[in-house]
Design a protein with these regions (language model features):
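Bacterial Sec-dependent N-terminal signal peptides
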Residues: 1-20
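Cysteine-dependent hydrolase recognition
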Residues: 19-522
Length: 522
């Protein structure tokens, strides 16, 4: 039975004289969650913040609401540790508004792909913005300095005596408004929180409408990989494959340009999960590549665009006519070939062609696009760069649509890997944050409400048991017999994590050898 407890708010003086308000849970639940925000964001979104808190509590999580005048990440981490000590069943947290950003150095071995010489390149480029600083309490960091330009950014070093692998204590997410979107950021945050709170009233929405898209050059353009992904998807999303058009599996080769078809799909109000498998940057997604040149005219257009852009990219450093003449000699083309070099109509058409191959944040803002999939995955490089003033993932949650949570990366990310590992847990009522915690990387983050979950295929208590039965080997052994692949995978993972003496290796090996599920054997 839910037991009412006294509403309590108190002030804590933290290092640097930050005044922190902690509003404790109004209900008692088996596990807990923390909302962490800055004082100004709280003051401007108070009603919406409390609506969200109440909705999360009604969804089964005792919820703390913490605001402070944060001067550095250590102050935030101190209150997280204090809350965790008070409530060991704390399973996750969300950072809303202007919560300081930790950029970590000496930890590139914890990324999937990011490798940059920290001595040769600027600090803001060679460090990794990561919230593992907040959610992995096992790691040890040494403060270096505050950024001289962006005072919300702080550099830390992962110490040599720290654990050298990720093992997050709890899940986390950011609700960070992209400043370049302009407008009233507090009104936008409040609107999002109300949307997230209202969505929790729907207790029956199962994960049965899924869309997957592979962009140009993803997984080396391998069509066999693209087709074989469906074997895993059938195990991840059984409800989607049980209904007509419940699952769509697109590839960039199907249309050029593809972006406008994707815009239509993104506006479908029945869509639950949208997965972008593509290359990217902070403010862009690579959707199409150049069309295959099947005739002379297409080859000529592509060559013309390539050489024209090569010349113009060096203008300013050298004289344009000199560059043109050198290019003519190098590529064995005549002067007539460059007749459109100063033609505005050529450059307009070239720019439109280039723009059609990408989705950029300007597209989303100009079109006022309302995205409706409840959850969107971006397994591209940089799409989750919340430390920038604009980033793709932020644009997808801050609009008038129904999107509640996005997954993205702050740095470049390895793509020839199992990007959909454990994603089928979402079909079984596991929260988005719990799923993301299981596949943690230094650069990987969630944006929006990490407590979001779909209704499970069958009633279960997995979302609670992941925390309260974490080290209960008997409980997880029993789930090895689940009829669902991802539940078995979770059981194997939890057993492996709890098996510090490596006593269960024969059992896990037997399961691997005998399972009929593709994803179990992965």
């Amino acid at each position: 039975m839910i037991k009412k407890i006294i509403y309590l708010a108190f002030l804590l003086p933290l290092a640097g004289n930050a005044q922190t308000t902690v509003i404790k849970p109004l209900v008692k639940q088996p596990t807990a969650f923390a909302i962490i925000t800055d004082n100004q964001t709280y003051a401007n979104t108070k009603d919406a913040m409390h609506q969200y808190k109440t909705a999360v509590e009604d969804d089964g999580l005792a919820t703390y609401l913490i605001s402070g005048d944060w001067q550095n990440p250590d102050q935030v981490k101190q209150i997280i540790i204090k809350t965790y000590q008070e409530c060991p069943s704390l399973e996750g947290l969300v950072l809303i508004g202007d919560v300081p950003v930790a950029l970590v150095r000496n930890a590139q071995h914890m990324t999937t792909a990011f490798k940059m010489n920290e001595k040769a390149f600027p600090w803001d480029q060679s460090s990794v913005p990561t919230d593992r600083f907040y959610d992995d309490l096992n790691l040890k960091f040494e403060f270096i300095r505050q950024d001289s330009v962006n005072h919300q950014h702080f550099y830390y070093k992962l110490t040599e005596d720290s654990p050298q692998r990720l093992n997050p204590t709890f899940y986390s997410a950011r609700i960070k408004y992209p400043e370049k979107k302009e407008g009233d950021k507090y009104a936008a945050i409040a609107s999002y929180l109300k949307k997230a709170a209202a969505a929790k009233a729907d207790k029956h929405n199962q994960l049965d409408r899924v869309f997957s898209f592979n962009g140009a050059s993803y997984n080396s353009d391998c069509l066999i990989v693209w087709m074989d992904d469906e074997k895993a998807y059938m195990e991840n999303f059984p409800l989607a494959f049980g209904r007509q058009m419940g699952f769509k599996h697109w590839n960039f080769r199907m249309k050029h340009p593809m972006k406008y078809k994707l815009f239509s799909e993104l506006q479908r109000k029945d869509l639950d999960l949208f997965m972008f498998h593509e290359h990217g940057m902070p403010t862009g997604q690579l959707i199409n590549d150049e069309l295959a040149c099947t005739d002379f005219n297409n080859r000529y257009k592509m060559l013309k665009s390539t050489l024209y852009n090569a010349v113009m990219s060096h203008v300013g450093k050298r004289d344009k006519d000199t560059l043109r003449i050198q290019m003519q000699e190098k590529r064995q083309v005549n002067e007539v070939f460059f007749k459109d070099l100063d033609n505005p109509k050529f450059w307009e058409a070239d720019s439109l062609h280039y723009a059609d191959e990408r989705i950029v944040t300007e597209d989303l803002m100009k079109r006022n696009l309302s995205t409706n999939p409840k959850m969107i995955m971006f397994d591209a490089c940089y799409n989750g760069s919340f430390h920038e003033n604009d980033y793709i993932a932020g644009q997808y949650i801050f609009n008038d649509g129904q999107t509640l949570v996005a997954q993205g990366n702050t740095r470049n990310v390895l793509q020839d890997r199992w990007t959909i590992e454990m994603i089928g847990l979402l079909s079984h009522g596991v929260r988005a944050g719990q799923y993301n915690k299981l596949i943690a990387s230094l650069e990987g983050h969630l944006f929006g409400d990490p407590t979001f979950r779909f209704a499970p295929i069958e009633a279960n208590t997995l979302s609670t048991d992941i925390t309260i039965h974490k080290d209960d080997k008997a409980y997880w052994k029993n789930l090895l017999n689940s009829p669902y692949a991802d539940v078995q995978s979770l059981a194997m993972r939890m057993l492996a994590d709890a098996d510090t003496q490596k006593e269960l290796s024969p059992l896990l090996l037997k399961k691997y050898r005998e399972s009929g599920f593709n994803t179990i054997r992965m």
